[in-house]
């Protein structure tokens, strides 16, 4: 995993699968969405195989691994089931995330500092099979430093607090928290990605932060695609972040 010279867009297709699973049909196909996203300029495709299988299924992951022209960023919880699955399919990129059954979406970052031995073991186990691991964490120096200690080459900073901020003061504070996290991560020698809750009206400020390698965005893209189509939604987002990062 190397730092890109330009900002990258990772497209999360989980919620295409959410729509499919709502009726238990074969459509819409997240694999087709992934291929359309690639054609529209996505630099990678992100999928989260959750313990409860609420959206992405094993079959989706296997198909994507075979057909993607870019790369798959496989999000997973730190469980024996997921580690064994990863060892079987060997995705090039894995992002370890926290996970609870009751949450609507990932609610916070992984507590690396509070479980260093467990996370280090997972990172080492995945590295042995050639997987490059990132850790989804809050923009907190303690968690960033712990991520470095456990051997992860990359982190993804949770931008949910920024996305949820209501007042201009709160927005500015949370944006600065992300910017400080990026700077600290880079100083630790880590590749720094970011994502969660980003959409067409708040993404530019984050994309403008110097040093961010990649933004992972999903729900907003799928929602916008209902009105403009998936390729157009991805192309619009890609144009926004590239322009903001200049």
UniProtKB/Swiss-Prot annotation:
Question: What does UniProt list as this organism's lineage?
Answer: Bacteria, Pseudomonadati, Pseudomonadota, Gammaproteobacteria, Pseudomonadales
Q: Keywords in UniProt for this one?
A: Cytoplasm, Pyridoxine biosynthesis, Transferase
Q: Which domain of life is it from?
A: Bacteria
Q: Which Pfam families match?
A: PdxJ (PF03740)
Q: Does the UniProt entry include the keyword Transferase?
A: yes
Q: Name one GO cellular component term.
A: cytosol
Site Transition state stabilizer: which residues? 156
The answer to keyword Cytoplasm applying to this record is: yes
Q: What is this protein called?
A: Pyridoxine 5'-phosphate synthase
Family from the record: Belongs to the PNP synthase family.
GO BP term, example: pyridoxine biosynthetic process
Q: Give the EC number.
A: 2.6.99.2
Q: Which residues bind 3-amino-2-oxopropyl phosphate?
A: 12, 23, 197, 218-219
Root EC class:
transferase
Q: How does it assemble?
A: Homooctamer; tetramer of dimers.
Q: Which of this chain's residues are annotated to bind 1-deoxy-D-xylulose 5-phosphate?
A: 14-15, 50, 55, 105
Gene3D superfamilies, per this entry? Aldolase class I (3.20.20.70)
* GO-annotated molecular function: pyridoxine 5'-phosphate synthase activity
Known role? Catalyzes the complicated ring closure reaction between the two acyclic compounds 1-deoxy-D-xylulose-5-phosphate (DXP) and 3-amino-2-oxopropyl phosphate (1-amino-acetone-3-phosphate or AAP) to form pyridoxine 5'-phosphate (PNP) and inorganic phosphate.
- Which compartments does it reside in? Cytoplasm
Q: Give the residues annotated as active site.
A: 48 (proton acceptor), 75 (proton acceptor), 196 (proton donor)
Q: Which reaction does it catalyse?
A: 3-amino-2-oxopropyl phosphate + 1-deoxy-D-xylulose 5-phosphate = pyridoxine 5'-phosphate + phosphate + 2 H2O + H(+)
Give the metabolic or biological pathway. Cofactor biosynthesis; pyridoxine 5'-phosphate biosynthesis; pyridoxine 5'-phosphate from D-erythrose 4-phosphate: step 5/5
InterPro entries in the record? Aldolase_TIM, PyrdxlP_synth_PdxJ, Pyridoxine-5'_phos_synth
NCBIfam families noted in UniProt? pdxJ, PRK05265.1-1, PRK05265.1-3, PRK05265.1-5
